[in-house]
Amino acid sequence: LKMFDWKKPTVQMLGRWQPWHKGHQELFKRCIDKTGQVIIQVRDVEGASGGKGQDDNPFSWETVCKNIESNLKKDGYNRGVDYEIMLVPNITNITYGRGVGYVFEEEIFDEDISSISATKIRASLREKGKL
């Protein structure tokens, strides 16, 4: 039985996930291809500001987890096996020294993915009375 291995090299995805959407799903797929498992870190921003231009955070930790789990399940990924989700403080800065043993990588996507906007998704949910 394969389980999430806390000692194994792992890709970190840090974000607000307000809400998790197709762009995040595609990023996850690239991440899991690198090491076989991913830790999704959810910044604790419900009802708070995540920084400049990041004040709109209506989804709770519980809702964010449900959104992530249900979407990843559609593509066959299981929490506790392929990934784990962790609540973390409202991280706004990441600093490091030299030779730390990890890298920062930006993934570039085509316009159909890069144009997805959580801001627009939240606005649409509000228009439909779902948020």
PLM regions: where:
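Nucleotidyltransferase catalytic core that binds NTPs
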Residues: L1-L131
